[in-house]
UniProtKB/Swiss-Prot annotation:
It comes from Arabidopsis thaliana (Mouse-ear cress). This is Protein DETOXIFICATION 16. Belongs to the multi antimicrobial extrusion (MATE) (TC 2.A.66.1) family. It is found in: Membrane. It comes from the Eukaryota. GO terms for cellular component: membrane; plant-type vacuole; plastid. Keywords: Membrane, Transmembrane, Transmembrane helix, Transport. GO terms for biological process: response to nematode; xenobiotic detoxification by transmembrane export across the plasma membrane. It holds the Pfam family MatE.
């Protein structure tokens, strides 16, 4: 047993007293990573929120249309691109740990190529937003405006895919502060841009969508300039290379499950709001569920940052052949997630009677939101655990296993449970959210079991094999003739 522990196999028991210094060091590394990643998530999330806020001053109809178009864009485009790009958490993270620095730029270029191609059919879907919304029963006037808004957002889908690639590329190198800076500059300028395009240009609500596109592209340009000219990226970015066009299929084998992991989860939450419209008193139920979803989404930024830190630390250590340190990183991030979720959950419960006032002055809505807050607190606890465990999965390259667990959790357990509670037992919107709680329990249990019984020595070997097989050039000395310096 003692030998197994020394080799880093399976056991995830908590650190011994003698390991306190390494635990402290690991906590510092993860907080140093997760803090900026949380800030980046919030700043990029604010981009869409700011646009919708400006549109809200034009009237309720444009506001409804912009909100629906934004939600439609998230479901049909942004979630897929974010999930696909998360394959770089594994590939770039492990390559950086193995000191195969040239591979990071190649892997990012592969991802850029794939995501740009994927954006073409997604943009066609966005161009037909109006027809699709009408087909699914949306009000014609809202669908028309939403379709117009989505068309002006089409350039943003190409930028968003590239932006995700740059984010993961720099994150894998533990170089996240430039991402925070560029996101901060972009979001600050976005406020001015929205004001000009919405109120001064004559574009009206379409100006907000165009502002999204411009801001995303501005962020991409800023990050590209940093990557190209910064000395910190001189080893990982050596210019565009034809090598990136090889081995696309191995990349897709990891990218497709990565996309499914994210999409299956995000789609279930959007389905929650759609189903709330079928309940008795749909206006109240939809309003309250939207408030809960917005609150939950904002709180989710914290465990999402921890998840990014976990995937980076674990992939780096596995790539470097340090299974024991990778296992320690898992222990530490789980402890941080538990502590964070207890604090956030306590705050949610303490403010339950006043939180609804931030969204509505109607007492019925405020009272309903107050009754939902303890459920949200429980959901936040479970969501924090599943987030960091999903980060562990990405760091190890378990995206296929994660996609299977997410499929079973949300669509075999969560959605059916929510439907049963909401419509058969007449629990209403609480029942739909309790269905998500059931899904999170199964998801945490499944990912937790996989993590607990992991042979970390074996994972380190798999990382080495993945790095060696990801390019036909084993030592990755890229031929100068295959590189275009730009």
């Amino acid at each position: 047993m003692r030998d197994d522990r020394e080799r880093g196999e399976g056991d995830l028991s908590w650190p011994l007293i003698g390991e306190k210094s390494s635990v402290k060091e690991e906590v510092k590394k993860q907080l140093w990573l997760s803090g900026p990643l949380i800030a980046v998530s919030l700043l990029q999330f604010c981009l869409q929120v700011i646009s919708v806020m400006f549109v809200g001053h034009l009237g309720s109809l444009p506001l409804s249309a912009a909100s629906i178009a934004t939600s439609f864009a998230s479901v049909t485009g942004f979630s897929f691109l974010m999930g696909t790009a998360s394959a770089l958490d594994t590939l770039c993270g492990q390559a950086y740990g193995a000191k195969k620095y040239g591979m990071l730029g190649i892997q990012m270029q592969r991802a850029m190529f794939v995501l740009t191609l994927a954006s073409i059919p997604l943009s066609i879907i966005w161009a037909n937003t109006e027809h699709l919304l009408v087909f699914f029963g949306q009000n014609k006037s809202i669908a028309t405006l939403a379709g117009s808004y989505a068309k002006f957002m089409i350039p943003s889908i190409f930028a968003y895919g590239l932006l995700q690639c740059f984010n993961r590329f720099l994150q894998a190198q533990n170089n996240v502060f430039p991402v925070v800076f560029c996101s901060g500059v972009t979001t600050s300028l976005h406020v001015l841009l929205c004001w000009v395009l919405v109120f001064k240009s004559g574009l009206g609500f379409q100006g907000a969508a165009l502002a999204n596109s411009i801001s995303y592209w501005l962020n991409v340009v800023l990050l590209f300039c940093y990557v190209k000219f910064s000395p910190s990226c001189s080893l990982t970015w050596t210019g565009f290379s034809k090598e990136a066009l090889r081995d696309i299929l191995p990349f897709l084998r990891l990218a497709v499950p990565s996309a499914l992991m994210v999409c299956l989860e995000m789609w279930s939450f959007e389905l929650l709001v759609l189903l709330s419209g079928l309940l008795p008193n749909p206006v109240l139920e939809t309003s309250v569920l939207s408030i809960c979803l917005n609150t939950s989404g904002t709180m989710w930024m914290i465990p999402f940052g921890l998840s990014g830190a976990a995937s980076t630390r674990i992939s780096n250590e596995l790539g470097a052949g340090n299974p024991k340190v990778a296992k320690l990183a898992v222990r530490v991030v789980i402890c941080i997630a538990v502590a964070e979720s207890i604090v956030i959950g306590s705050v949610l419960i303490l403010i339950r009677n006043i939180w609804g006032l931030a969204y509505s002055s109607e007492l019925e809505v405020v009272s309903y939101v107050a009754s939902m807050m303890p459920i949200l607190a429980l959901g936040n606890f479970l969501d924090s655990l599943q987030c960091v465990l999903s980060g562990v999965a990405r760091g190890c390259g378990w995206q296929k296993i994660g996609a299977i667990i997410n499929l079973g959790s949300y669509y075999l357990v969560g959605v059916p449970s929510g439907l049963l509670l909401a419509f058969h037992f007449h629990v209403g919107g609480r029942g739909l959210w309790l269905g998500i709680i059931c899904a999170l329990v199964v998801q945490v249990f499944g990912l937790g079991l996989v993590t607990i019984f992991t042979n970390w020595d074996e994972e380190a070997k798999k990382a080495t094999n993945r790095i060696e097989s990801s390019s036909s050039v084993k030592d990755f000395a890229v031929d100068d003739r295959s590189v275009v310096v730009f």
